[in-house]
Amino acid sequence: MVTMCGGHRPENFLHQVLTEFGEELAGEGKSEVGGGAPRSYLQVASAECWAAAPAVHVGEPVHAGGLHTERGADPVIGLYLVHRGGACQTPTVGNRQTPTLGIHARPRRRATTSLLTLLLAFGKNAVRCALIGPGSLTSRTRPLTEPLGEKERREVFFPPRPERVEHNVESSRWEPRRRGACGSRGGNFPSPRGGSGVASLERAESSSTEPAKAIKPIDRKSVHQICSGPVVPSLSTAVKELVENSLDAGATNIDLKLKDYGVDLIEVSGNGCGVEEENFEGLTLKHHTSKIQEFADLPQVETFGFRGEALSSLCALSDVTISTCHVSAKVGTRLVFDHYGKIIQKTPYPHPRGMTVSVKQLFSTLPVHHKEFQRNIKKKRACFPFAFCRDCQFPEASPAMLPVQPAELTPRSTPPHPCSLEDNVITVFSSVKNGPGSSR
């Protein structure tokens, strides 16, 4: 019977197992070595630090001399053990003699050195051992006084590798990462890169117990940036969302300013109702809106926006600053937002009733999109007056578009009364060509 010496110490338990198997090897090894005093498994494991390093878990069914375990049953580990003779005689090849290796030198792969595998299957009340070697196979079932705990099993499976390794991999003809007797890659030799074998064994353990997940959730920052792109794909969409936001607030006068064709700055000011102070926090958060509260409210929506995505997406794509003053407030407020729609600066600011939204460096958080936007913005500028006349109708207001560049362009506006798209286009482009007040 194998008892747990030292209070469930796994190394003591392995010490007993290796000792008993070492006694059998001592009887078998004399004939193999040819008269030399053989070294037992335990002696090899204590003298050579790399000799008793464990392999990974056996993932496939194991059948070896009465040792039988299926996948997912009792945990099975394999220990690669090296047995060699103590005295190395000088072999003779023809008329040439090879020099005798020193006692501390690692022998080359000869008949005096053999690789064996010790399989241990831990059950609830017993441990089954199987020794696989060249021409010898031994299997036993040994009861345990008490079953091993999870922590002790882990220490048995993956003991810490000693710091000092008396094995030169470069001069060895043994392949460091060949397939072992347990059917798993790895082995009892140090990594040729000098890394710790324990970390690789732990990775092998996790890969064998849990399958690697190829589908993983995207982090919230990336999701916010990815989802904001389709909401505001272009400059015209950004202007449209800001203008519609002012219309929903009841604005009758909307000013639109573009700096460097909208690359540096987009500013939309409207004389709407403004925003109350208690609503500042949710002003630019994703899916925060005052238009609806649930899906059933959609048939009653009478505004342009109701999803609560426009300002949040603009925050994710640019630097947004909002200046507002509610009808009930005595002084305005200037709010600076980060890319997540959170307020990072809040200061009193003189502002008339309404709200002004400033968008700086549109698409700056998307480098490829920003570069494409800068390259094509001048080409799209020619279509902007037409889009302005088509999308922005002001039946009860008199919006004006005052260009900053070039200076020779004159102010142009649409009539304050409802009219057709053709009338708007003729009015705007005739004012650009002939000046204000020209006839059609």
Swiss-Prot record:
Tissue specificity as recorded in UniProt: Highly expressed in kidney, spleen, adrenal gland, ovary and cerebellum and to a lower extent in liver, esophagus, stomach, duodenum, colon, bladder, uterus, lung, pancreas and cerebrum. Not expressed in heart.
Note: Encoded by one of the numerous copies of postmeiotic segregation increased 2-like genes scattered in the q11-q22 region of the chromosome 7.
UniProt region (Disordered), positions on chain: 164-215
GO cellular component entries: mismatch repair complex
Gene3D superfamilies: Histidine kinase-like ATPase, C-terminal domain
Disulfide bonds: none
Family designation: Belongs to the DNA mismatch repair MutL/HexB family.
Name of one Pfam family that matches: HATPase_c_3
Compositionally biased intervals (Basic and acidic residues): 164-178
GO biological process terms, semicolon-separated: mismatch repair
Record CDD domains: HATPase_MutL-MLH-PMS-like
InterPro entries: DNA_mismatch_repair_CS, HATPase_C_sf, MutL/Mlh/Pms-like
Protein name: Putative postmeiotic segregation increased 2-like protein 1
Organism: Homo sapiens (Human)
Alphabetically ordered keywords of this record: Kinase, Transferase
The organism's place on the tree of life at top rank: Eukaryota
Domain Histidine kinase positions: 230-364
